[in-house]
Amino acid sequence: MGRLIIAEKHSVAQAIAAALGGGKAEDGWIGCGADAVTWAQGHLVDLLTPDEYQDRGWDKWSMDALPLDPTGGWKWKVNRQRGADRQYRVVAGLLKSDAYDVLVNACDPDREGESIFHRIVSYAGTRKPMLRLWVASLEEDAIRNALDSMRSEDEYRGLAEAADIRAKADWLIGMNASRAYTLVYHRRM
């Protein structure tokens, strides 16, 4: 069995593959012996927009519909921009493959990197053991050292939760304020 290593960017995935001894480039991933390295291409999974909550009637802009509040029923979707949906399908297929028994988060070492990884894994519905590859440099020796000192992904879970809380707060404030301001502004014209 092998490890599925998910980087945030293609360039980081290439550097990790090189540190693993190179590999065979496939469509959206790199095979490195029993391991595979793929990339997220940024945010592959995002929150729905208000219009996409079909059951809430938020597609009509009115003050009566405010505040928009999906709390308790937040929904996620695959990002359809810049070919992200195609890359998501590649990553999801690898996540579901029996060839990989351990997932490795090699996304950027920050809250957003944690969030990007966890959104993909959660949306794909995968439950496998997870490790964290904390890469601070793309030098091969630094990557090899990081590969030798990986820790449980659980130790970094708080970073992903903080990023998701920020994303939901941004959504609540941004979507409600934008609609309220637009509706009030158009009434005055």
Q: What residue spans do the PLM features occupy?
A:
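Intrinsically disordered, low-complexity regulatory segments
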Residues: 1-185
